[in-house]
Amino acid sequence: MDCLDKIVQLKKMGKKIGFTCSTFELGPHSGHDVMLMECKQNCDFLIVGLLTDPTISRPEKNKPVQSTFERWIQITSNKYVDMVIPFDTECDLEDMLKIIMPDVRFCGEEYKGKTHTGSNIEGIKIFYNKRNHSFSS
């Protein structure tokens, strides 16, 4: 069963599909774990989009030190994560959101009130992760 078939099956079962994304560089560390735990507490099935290299869409960002495969291994082994889907660009992210149509998308609270990739897609509830800790994220 491929990723999309699995998601369709879960939706038919009435499961709440959640989605979050990040580069997850040098992690997952404690900040990532707290964020992923909060995501999983608010959905039945958590999909994580793994940004391969943020410099592709945003040259001002830092290139990851770890390979995509290293980061994929770390994220797939996290107990709160049910599926990991790598993506390359913000355009890929928007397409992925339109295809998956998760019930809830998790974003950091620093995005509240701001336009961000996929924020214009109707039908996806946005949940803003709290940053009420001092861990890096």
Residue ranges and their predicted role:
Residues 1-137:
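Nucleotidyltransferase catalytic core that binds NTPs
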